[in-house]
Amino acid sequence: MAQSEVNSVCVASDRAGDTGDQSDDSSDGSLFKTQCAPSPIQKQRHPTVKRVTLPASVETDSSSDSSIEPRPLTLKAIFERFKKKKRKKRKKRKYEPKLRPRGRPRGKPSGTRITRRSQIDAKQIKDKGAVFPFLESESGRKPLPWKKILTYEQAVARGFFHHIEKLKYEHHLKECLKQMHAGEDLEKEDLDSRRHKYMDDDGSLSPIEEPLTEDEATNPQAECDIKLVEDSCFIISSEFSRKRNLEQEKIKKESTFSKKAKDATHREKGHRRTLKGNEHVTIEEDSRPQPRPFAHLQSKVMKKGELEYLEVHHLCGLSQPL
């Protein structure tokens, strides 16, 4: 292919050279004839064929894929491959300012303040919903505040749902009585009385009376658990607590008197109690009066002989001179 393309290019260049020579001859022969400008030669663009040269290692690998067994992946190989990978840098996002207004809105005076009351229409203020005339007379205010109206509306809704629940129980009980073929006189009673009659802690009780056995007929009060008792059995008398308080006060007084008597006896004997660790230890004291220190300084101005006499007596342990 390449040789044929080169040959065609050579032929085209020869033809162009011949035409150029002929034009030169004609121009030399006839000077007065108008000369035609030669048209530019259009060179053929050679299509570049890109050959992808595969490395020898790839060719050998492709040929020897069937012979070589696949290597088992290990953690070390996975980590090395992850480290060699070039991580793409994230593009830094430019700050795009939001179109929210900042600061105080313009066109409004600084003193004005938007309140919730200003947003409520006049019709909403007039029509407060449910009216409670008996509550208005008790509270003394004709237009009740919003908080009270909300609490009363909630109470009304609660009572309504309780009434629906009661009606549902009644309807269910009537259906059960019809299935049990109970009398019509039982259906005429109120729900509360029927509830206590047919329900018990252990389970549901049948409204149909069961026939009594022979033992129950002979001894009707044998298995009776209910007994009428006076009210005094249930009320605890307060005399017991008073007596108990008086006894406690007496015991306290006796203990205080005994402590005082012991302290007085210890003082008379001249004993003194001291703490030795965590135990009280009694120490006997001398009943004799101890000499006062510096007694000679308290006396008035004396003669030298009297002072010497007092000092001698003081050193001997005598409080007063003989």
Curated annotation (Swiss-Prot):
The modification Phosphoserine is found at S23, S137, S232. Residues 257-267 have a biased composition (Basic and acidic residues). Residues 1-70, 82-116, 198-219, 257-276 are annotated as: Disordered. One of its GO terms (biological process) is regulation of DNA-templated transcription. It holds the Pfam family TAF1D. Residues 82-107 have a biased composition (Basic residues). One of its GO terms (cellular component) is nucleoplasm. Keywords: DNA-binding, Nucleus, Phosphoprotein, Transcription, Transcription regulation. It is found in: Nucleus. One of its GO terms (molecular function) is DNA binding. Component of the transcription factor SL1/TIF-IB complex, composed of TBP and at least TAF1A, TAF1B, TAF1C and TAF1D. Interacts with UBTF. Component of the transcription factor SL1/TIF-IB complex, which is involved in the assembly of the PIC (preinitiation complex) during RNA polymerase I-dependent transcription. The rate of PIC formation probably is primarily dependent on the rate of association of SL1/TIF-IB with the rDNA promoter. SL1/TIF-IB is involved in stabilization of nucleolar transcription factor 1/UBTF on rDNA. Formation of SL1/TIF-IB excludes the association of TBP with TFIID subunits. This is TATA box-binding protein-associated factor RNA polymerase I subunit D. It comes from Mus musculus (Mouse).
